[in-house]
Amino acid sequence: MPPPAEEFAVDDLDEFESRLDSFLNRFHADDLRRILLPFPDGKLHFPLVIDFAELLEFDPEVAHQLYDYPKDVLELFDAAAQRALDKFDAAARRADKRKAGDETMEKKFVHVRVNTSGSALECPEASPSIGKVRVKHRGTLLTLKGTVIRSGGVKMIEGERKYQCRKCKCRFTVHPELEAGNRITLPASCKSKSAKGCGGANFQLIEDSITCHDYQEIKIQENIQLLGVGSIPRSMPIILMDDLVDIVKAGDDVVVTGRLSAKWSPDIKDVRSNLDPMLIANFVRRTNELKSDLDIPVEIINKFEEFWAASRATPLKGRNSILKGICPQIYGLFTVKLAVALTLIGGVQHVDASGTKVRGEPHMLLVGDPGTGKSQFLKFAAKLSNRSVITTGLGSTSAGLTVTAVKDGGEWMLEAGALVLADGGLCCIDEFDSMREHDRTTIHEAMEQQTISIAKAGLVTTLNTRTTVFGATNPKGQYDPNESLSVNTTLSGPLLSRFDIVLVLLDTKNKKWDKIVSSHILAENTEEKKGKTSDPEVMWTLSMLRRYIHYVKQHFKPVLTKEAERVISSYYQRQRQSGTRNAARTTVRMLESLIRLAQAHARLMFRNDVTKLDAIAAILCIESSMTTSAIVDTAGNALHSNFTENPDQECILKCDSIAYLSKNIKYLTDEISN
């Protein structure tokens, strides 16, 4: 595309405006008529969203002018929308189609909003990352994607005022310069279009002619996942006006289309003023509801269905094929891989009878000796999640994890922390034990209620933190199996009770295990092994696992069956009656954890019913967490857990074991075959 001229100019302005009218009448007549529906206040601002792809197909020249000169063309578009609105209003009145008392107030504020989704403007040139915005983009229509990290208050700003020449009484409108601190500059001489000209330079402000607009400043930051290691995420201030204000909050993922401009930095003594870039928004779209930009074609969904149709006779073997795709470079650790999958998939959020929301996202903590693969699982889980934030306990404070109150230009604003930025995704915290006790207590509310209540600098609000927390920590010194988790990890009981799964990975001496693991690591580096994968697992690559997790979370809402309820209830009662129970773990939260994990396992198994098999899988995950009060002897060490040849038959044996110890339920051994 050739570089645009310095100023907007067309050969025939009337003809250009008629083309805008034709576009609106052809594609948005119904939208304009909907704006005419009864509203209590005619001073409201109404958006009219147009599709840039439709405009480009209808009139390429107008679309190019809109890209090159968005400020001028959007003003003409707003005027065209107002003309069309007045025309439809007059036509309806003449036709007398309105009922008595259905008269509407005149709508004076209609703004054309440009949606560039699915158009040519999604190319890297017109939709760069925030860190790649340059001077060449100034004045053009730009689309930026990012996360809202700061949200200011809604203010009132002057939009225009009218003056009258004292000499010829000519009236004209003056718009403030937003880039210059909303300063108004009067013309040097009268703008009269009379043949003789006026030449007057003395103007008088017309009373009650000042028009004000709602105004809000936010700041968005580019997606951390799209950056390379060592890159600093860049941010961009965004100006929202009129109907766009207060539609996003800190932590929201947004796509913003607008005009790139610049404003002078505040005057500070002995500091040189600079031009800071800013985007004057025309259209804002929240992408929180999407949670993912993953495009799952029908062919991929058919592959999922075919896979489970082929695994109908041996469903657990099919499940294990999926689990082997998680951290394939690490041998074994079946229990950990199952727990990671269930944590990422999660259960179903619901609202109880009192109106309290019960979270569906599980939390997971890995406690283990150095070299047991904890950080590897954290990084792989972050890759599998559509939205993730990775941090370490040593480099995290309570403000950095939750929210910070910052002062900008004399006004206090809230800046989102890691848990808010990970809303709807995964927050990985490595070296969890390195956090100070005060910082750890600040995330209690974020983990259980999934909100953060803020009362800082006069700002009182609540932000969403609907995120899964995945932590990793080392034990304090040598792990003592006879002591509780609180003693071994120095983590408080209230914090431990919020983790659904706490897996302990002990690097104990095991000659057979060491030989198998060393052979696996050496085989990965031989020429014969490179580039080869086993046939059952060749399907479950990283991208396929991401699509699968996203698909089952969106399309399956499992419900517990009566048999699954009895299994979970019996196990919970057995744990509460155990003489060696851990008081910090065996609370009502453990019962909720069992339900969440059972629902997650049902999703993993590609179904909408939580069966006894899912309940037993959830119990086995919890059993691996109950290091001192496990009631199933077959739980074993999570570090040495491996994939079995016949998992379906082995599950029947574990069913019998749990049934015998629970003593409340008669298990049917044909559960899997049915």
Swiss-Prot record:
Keyword terms: ATP-binding, DNA damage, DNA repair, DNA-binding, Helicase, Hydrolase, Meiosis, Metal-binding, Nucleotide-binding, Nucleus, Zinc, Zinc-finger
GO term, biological process aspect, one: double-strand break repair via homologous recombination
Assigned EC number: 3.6.4.12
Segments forming C4-type zinc fingers: 165-198
SUPFAM superfamilies membership: Nucleic acid-binding proteins, P-loop containing nucleoside triphosphate hydrolases
Binding-site residues for ATP, renumbered to this chain: 368-375
GO cellular component, one term: nucleus
PROSITE patterns: MCM_2 (PS50051)
Pfam families named among the record's database cross-references: MCM (PF00493), MCM_lid (PF17855), MCM_N (PF14551), MCM_OB (PF17207)
Subcellular location: Nucleus
Catalytic activity as recorded in UniProt: ATP + H2O = ADP + phosphate + H(+)
Keyword presence, Zinc: yes
GO molecular function: ATP binding; ATP hydrolysis activity; helicase activity; single-stranded DNA binding; zinc ion binding
Domain of life: Eukaryota
Domain MCM: residue ranges: 318-521
Described function: Probable DNA helicase that may play a role in DNA repair during meiosis.
The protein, known as: Probable DNA helicase MCM9
